[in-house]
Amino acid sequence: MHHELTSLLKKLLCSHKDVSRLPALLRTSCLFGQGEKADTLYFIEEGLIKLTRTNDLGGRVILAVYGPNELVGEESLSAGKHFYFAEAEVLSPATVYKIPGATLESVKSAHPELGVALVRGLVDSNLGFAQKLEWLSLHDVESRVLYYLEQLAKLVEPAEDQGYPLPLTQLELADLVGATRETTSTTLNSLEKRGFVKLSRRLLTVYLRQGKAAAAGGENWP
């Protein structure tokens, strides 16, 4: 997200009397459900939040995973009555700011620069979804897995062994990259043998240094 938008949100909204800070949200906590009235915007201070869309047949896709200084619930910015397109669920212990739509509108009216920054942020978000569509449509499963692991690693701090711990199950990664759990599991096992990842229960550790070194040697890495 644009640094300008992050700064404005912290300056104008995070300390606002009508904005609530929700600390220490646990994994699987739900910020909002798919189809619920969209009347609140959320700003992530720490932790990871996933957006999941479910169709009428029970099929799922994780649209995105967001981290610190990012927004979820942008549907609340639309004029009129709108609903959340996907469910927002906590992936790792998180702290978020809950911004009522009416409060946001009031602050935007007093500070037009916030509205401009929000538009720029939405453009970035749209480009991100377009890029995801490109990867889903034009790349094989291993390439998609590697791409998303690298993107997600940017949202967390490295551990002492320089690995980036991602609190994802293999099924969640499959829902993110648009593949079956079985295919994703086979791909991850192959990547683990090559030293790119380490698999644990509800945790994938990504080793970017090994991946970049492998890419320099001609192996697949985005």
For the regions a language model picked out, list residue spans one by one.
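Cyclic nucleotide-binding regulatory module and flanking cytosolic helices
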Residues: 1-30, 71-72, 76-79, 110
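Cyclic nucleotide-binding regulatory domains
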Residues: 24, 29-92
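Residues that scaffold the ATP/ADP-binding catalytic core of kinase and kinase-like folds
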Residues: 52, 74-75, 106-107, 148, ...
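Short, well-ordered alpha-helical scaffold segment located
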Residues: 70-71, 103, 172, 211
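Polybasic "coupling" helices that flank or enter modular domains
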Residues: 109-178
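Phosphate-/nucleic-acid-contacting segments
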Residues: 152-222
